[in-house]
Amino acid sequence: MARAACLLRAISRVLLLPLPLLLLLLLLLPSPLMARARPPESHRHHPVKKGPRLLHAALPNTLTSVPASHWVPSPAGSSRPLRCGVPDLPDVLNARNRQKRFVLSGGRWEKTDLTYRILRFPWQLVREQVRQTVAEALQVWSEVTPLTFTEVHEGRADIMIDFARYWHGDNLPFDGPGGILAHAFFPKTHREGDVHFDYDETWTIGDNQGTDLLQVAAHEFGHVLGLQHTTAAKALMSPFYTFRYPLSLSPDDRRGIQHLYGRPQMAPTSPAPTLSSQAGTDTNEIALLEPETPPDVCETSFDAVSTIRGELFFFKAGFVWRLRSGRLQPGYPALASRHWQGLPSPVDAAFEDAQGQIWFFQGAQYWVYDGEKPVLGPAPLSKLGLQGSPVHAALVWGPEKNKIYFFRGGDYWRFHPRTQRVDNPVPRRSTDWRGVPSEIDAAFQDAEGYAYFLRGHLYWKFDPVKVKVLEGFPRPVGPDFFDCAEPANTFR
């Protein structure tokens, strides 16, 4: 203090100012240090500049292990990882969690039948696309638990879904394109069930040209159901976004959600209903009995096979088997009507077109679904330029899904989705497909462009380059697709 007083007296003599006047001038002039620390007016009041700093401050010790592929340029020239906005727990990496990677939020729903409502939608996508994607994201969790989800369109739902910008009322502001993609609130918290997506992201479905809504939504719904972030490799509940297709739960995700809610409940079996001896005598209605027990997948042939949303669906006698990345999914086989209400049983053929619509054939009729929503049918095959007996198999071929072939007996037709007609009502002979049997039950194309033809318990793999069946085929379907025991005598 003595030194400061001496310094002020010295300055007063140099400037020829009385000491009281010098002190008054120092108080009135703005402090250079304070001026440097104060942000520009536009930044001080900008809602975006303040929010993300508060949010990222609550994300402890997570950015050091982020792969470079997760980082994107920000408007300021720095880099930000694409990630969920739910803060990570500090003890996610502690020793206690190394064996059990999944982390629970401490809450769970006390019921298994939940409702959801979408309040606002992103501008890039059609509303029905968003609804279908949200339903698929919830289905990822319902397939491995007893949970069910039903959409409602008014009032308060258990899960409230919204697309919002910047500050939106929950003290977790969004930051514009990139960075924070979405966040959600856990069960038994003050905003339980709320899920918010950043409206300013470039939302897409099923591709990496933007941010895949299906993957982000499925991740956020994991939070809504009670899961925290995990450090397990390739887990859906990792805090950082990486595009993966098709979407699937990791073993860690599955263990976590089943720890909270258990495994899916199997429908109780009951004796098959008996028909009265007078059934049909006083009515012209036909009673359709759904099968109660699926056929043995290792002993059966299949009615139809199709690649739908990047997954394989095998159809038989009203049931469907769903394979993702070569693995049968939990909860399957299941009744096909679980996905496609009103679908007849059995189906003769099925395929998914380039627009994502799914076509089913039975007898002289066909049906079209947009996802799981029926949009057409039953309609006559004659509308497509086909006459006579049913379609036995349908094959979508080519990377653009623009080559569709219908097979029947030893004949085939090429179908044009744009005109909704076959190119010629007169079929060509299936001998054009070298090595493929004349009579087939089903056909599909894999992700690498190979075509598969099924007949009975066997399948033939067709090379699109050499335009013929590969050496070593046919092979049995059961062992190659469902891990069945290899038959003792296999026809080669």
Swiss-Prot record:
Residues 1-35 form the signal peptide. Zn(2+) 2 binds at residues 84, 219, 223, 229. One of its GO terms (cellular component) is extracellular region. Residues 36-101 form a propeptide. The active site is at 220. This is Stromelysin-3. The keyword Hydrolase applies. A motif (Cysteine switch) lies at residues 82-89. The lineage of its organism: Eukaryota, Metazoa, Chordata, Craniata, Vertebrata. Disulfide bonds join 298-484. It is found in: Secreted, Extracellular space, Extracellular matrix. Specifically expressed in the mammary gland during apoptosis. Its cofactor is Ca(2+); Zn(2+). GO terms for biological process: basement membrane organization; collagen catabolic process; collagen fibril organization; extracellular matrix organization; negative regulation of fat cell differentiation; proteolysis. Belongs to the peptidase M10A family. Zn(2+) 1 binds at residues 168, 170, 183, 196. The conserved cysteine present in the cysteine-switch motif binds the catalytic zinc ion, thus inhibiting the enzyme. The dissociation of the cysteine from the zinc ion upon the activation-peptide release activates the enzyme. It is an enzyme of class 3 (hydrolase). Transmembrane segments: none annotated. The precursor is cleaved by a furin endopeptidase. Hemopexin repeats lie at residues 295-343, 344-386, 388-436, 437-484. Keywords: Calcium, Cleavage on pair of basic residues, Collagen degradation, Disulfide bond, Extracellular matrix, Hydrolase, Metal-binding, Metalloprotease, Protease, Repeat, Secreted, Signal, Zinc, Zymogen. It comes from the Eukaryota. It holds the Pfam family Peptidase_M10. One of its GO terms (molecular function) is metallopeptidase activity. Its EC number is 3.4.24.-. May play an important role in the progression of epithelial malignancies.
